[in-house]
UniProtKB/Swiss-Prot annotation:
UniProt key word ATP-binding: yes
Name under which the protein is recorded: S-adenosylmethionine synthase
Organism: Rippkaea orientalis (strain PCC 8801 / RF-1) (Cyanothece sp. (strain PCC 8801))
Entry's EC annotation: 2.5.1.6
Residue numbers spanned by region Flexible loop: 100-110
GO cellular component: cytoplasm
Gene name tied to this protein: metK
Length: 422
């Protein structure tokens, strides 16, 4: 019997209060790793009306100006006008940073396997920075191997920010959210049920002063300048039955940190798969790659994406877990939700042979420590908004499908059937 249902995912723009915090945290991380790629960083940020608080634990040989980094990032996002209730030049920036706990540091610098003389392997030298579970996911719903709802929500958010920054819709302000509800039949996306955009805006637009007229213009402009371009190259498009909601409260003038306080790490579902896959609970931004909340989640995505790209499954979720101070994962699980084309027990063994999931191995494979210096001091801050996965606008090592051929060879599948990822 055919099953029809809706699945929804949301995204937020770079001007959302929580995303401001994520981007400042990762800007600090980039600066520290650029000057000292062995920096240990856990940078947390809070924003409110006229206030930025930078806190956390940092151990590094690098010396950077946290206040200057925060102001520069806030201005880049678009908060340069005090009328927004939050401005790069006028906000207060407070800094309260401690060093990483030596109790944690000793377990990362010398893993349990090394301290107990259980291994001389170089990749057993670094222990996990914390216990925890991490997930990675991929599916064949989009060319970038992401679920369609989150892919579209991010596209709309990025386009919304772009038309603001280009001056195409000059009345837009930095804060905004999007949400897309997809119609599924038997597990396959077949239609667009609802598109929702909430975007901060000026009180009046041109000569329009009545709020109803303002909202009508915003809705018309967003359909033409944002929604239609996003769906230009997508097979599934909105139709006459698709609901298009814009600022459903009726008004969105007060926004950004003036409207809501923001905090690093509070948009973890937006950062990953839009709720389509499970999440271990750990946030990414502000954390150096010895912290497996971040690095192992990237590695799990890398594994899952290569499995789907190799045609071994239509959907794949990878779970890995760690104990603090221990190099080797406590557990690894590969789940294909009944879409696997090969024996799953063998698939797990092949994954363990082809992919390195110890922290030092992840750092080495994905080059996570060196990327900020290799990219001119800017890397992690660019993934801090619009999702860490499925990015077609950034060159991200965990999005490579360079292991797909090896996976196929392990199961004697013709290499001509490998799908190349975006």
């Amino acid at each position: 019997m055919s099953r029809r249902y809706l699945f929804s995912s949301e995204s937020v723009t770079e001007g959302h209060p929580d995303k401001i915090c994520d981007q400042i945290s990762d800007t600090i991380l980039d600066a520290l790793l650029y000057h000292d790629d062995h920096s240990r960083v856990a940078a947390e940020v809070v924003v409110n009306t006229g206030l930025v608080l930078i806190t956390g634990e940092i151990t590094s040989k690098a010396h950077v100006n946290f206040v200057e980094l925060a102001r520069k990032k806030i201005a880049e996002i678009g908060y340069t006008d005090a009328d927004n209730g939050f401005s790069a030049n006028s906000c207060a920036v407070l800094v309260a940073i401690d060093e990483q706990s030596p109790d944690i540091s000793q377990g990362v610098s010398a893993a349990h396997e090394q301290r107990e003389s259980l291994s001389n392997d170089e990749l057993d030298q670094i222990g996990a920075g914390d216990q925890g579970i991490m997930f990675g996911y991929a599916c064949n719903e989009t060319p970038e191997f992401m679920p369609l709802p989150i892919s579209l929500a991010h596209r709309i958010s990025r386009r919304l920010a772009a038309v603001r920054k280009m001056g195409e819709l000059p009345y837009l302000r930095p804060d905004g959210k999007t949400q897309v509800s997809i119609v599924y039949e038997d597990g396959k996306p077949v239609g667009i049920d609802t598109i929702l955009i909430s975007t901060q805006h000026t009180e009046t637009i041109d000569s329009l002063t009545e709020n109803s007229a303002v909202q009508a213009k915003i809705k018309s402009d967003l359909w033409e300048a944002v929604v239609q371009p996003v769906f230009g190259d997508i097979e599934i498009k909105p139709n006459q039955d698709t609901r298009f909601l814009v600022n459903p409260t009726g008004k969105f003038v007060i926004g950004g940190p003036q409207g809501d306080a923001g905090l690093t790490g509070r948009k973890i579902i937006v950062d990953t798969y839009g709720g389509y896959s499970r999440h271990g609970g750990g946030a990414f931004s502000g954390k150096d790659p010895t912290k497996v909340d971040r690095s192992a989640a990237y590695a799990c995505r890398y594994v899952a994406k290569n499995i789907v790209a190799a045609g071994l499954a239509d959907k794949c979720e990878v779970q890995v877990s760690y104990a603090i101070g221990v190099a080797r994962p406590v557990s690894i699980l590969v789940e294909t939700f009944g879409t696997g084309k090969v024996d799953e027990d063998k698939l797990l063994k092949v994954v363990q042979e082809l992919f390195e999931l110890r922290p030092a191995g992840i750092l080495q494979t994905l080059n996570l420590r060196e990327l900020p210096s290799q990219r001119g001091g800017r890397f992690y801050q660019d993934v801090a908004a619009y999702g860490h996965f499925g990015r077609t606008d950034l060159d991200l090592p965990w999005e490579y499908t360079d292991k797909a051929n090896l996976l196929k060879e392990a199961f004697a599948i013709p290499l001509s059937e490998v799908r190349v990822g975006v």
